[in-house]
Amino acid sequence: MSSDIHQIKIGLTDNHPCSYLPERKERVAVALEADMHTADNYEVLLANGFRRSGNTIYKPHCDSCHSCQPIRISVPDIELSRSQKRLLAKARSLSWSMKRNMDENWFDLYSRYIVARHRNGTMYPPKKDDFAHFSRNQWLTTQFLHIYEGQRLIAVAVTDIMDHCASAFYTFFEPEHELSLGTLAVLFQLEFCQEEKKQWLYLGYQIDECPAMNYKVRFHRHQKLVNQRWQG
């Protein structure tokens, strides 16, 4: 599938405080054309550095900052690190499943996660309607990877699924759990992609200066989009 795009019509937001680097301002470019909002076109846009929030497709377009680097993993070429292999070994008693809808206990887990990890963020206080508006869309297949410890739900990874790739959209988990559940969710998403024979798993944006985001480079065989060229 070609990753080339022709010129598309975009709109620019005003500058506002950055969600990841609070001392900086951010601005995003938003795809305005309705015919770009399809699964096939979104797959091409992902390959060109775009992401979605709800039904909105966007990419960073900041005046003087280029810290947000799109990052993806080549699924057929994945090489797990020693620490990732140890994590999977420790997680042998856990199970995961991909579902079209979230477990009925999702909101209690989501609330604990937001209160513990993102009390100063835009998603606090946690609200069901806000998360539904943020995570759902009308033109793309979105499923939910659930991780269980016995019968207890401990993590949910919202996952967008296209013909040749998947995109890790958002993950929340039991904040006090002893295992690195965010990393584990990506490992299970990679397993899903292998089963479904996907080429890429997109992880969003890598931000080196943001500790909450820079775990993504620990996955070997990743590529980053630099100057509109995938490198790695």
Curated annotation (Swiss-Prot):
A Gene Ontology term for the protein's cellular component: cytoplasm
A single MF term (Gene Ontology): leucyl-tRNA--protein transferase activity
GO BP terms: ubiquitin-dependent protein catabolic process via the N-end rule pathway
Key words of the record: Acyltransferase, Cytoplasm, Transferase
Highest taxon of the lineage: Bacteria
Class of enzymatic activity (EC top level): transferase
A Pfam family annotated for this UniProt entry: ATE_N
EC number: 2.3.2.29
Catalytic activity annotation: N-terminal L-glutamyl-[protein] + L-leucyl-tRNA(Leu) = N-terminal L-leucyl-L-glutamyl-[protein] + tRNA(Leu) + H(+); N-terminal L-aspartyl-[protein] + L-leucyl-tRNA(Leu) = N-terminal L-leucyl-L-aspartyl-[protein] + tRNA(Leu) + H(+)
UniProt-reported outcome of changing Y58F: Strong decrease in activity
Protein location: Cytoplasm
Coiled coil regions, renumbered to chain: none
Function (record text): Functions in the N-end rule pathway of protein degradation where it conjugates Leu from its aminoacyl-tRNA to the N-termini of proteins containing an N-terminal aspartate or glutamate.
UniProt cross-references to HAMAP family, sorted A to Z: Bpt
Family to which the UniProt record says this protein belongs: Belongs to the R-transferase family. Bpt subfamily.
Protein known as: Aspartate/glutamate leucyltransferase
Organism: Vibrio vulnificus (strain CMCP6)
Gene: bpt
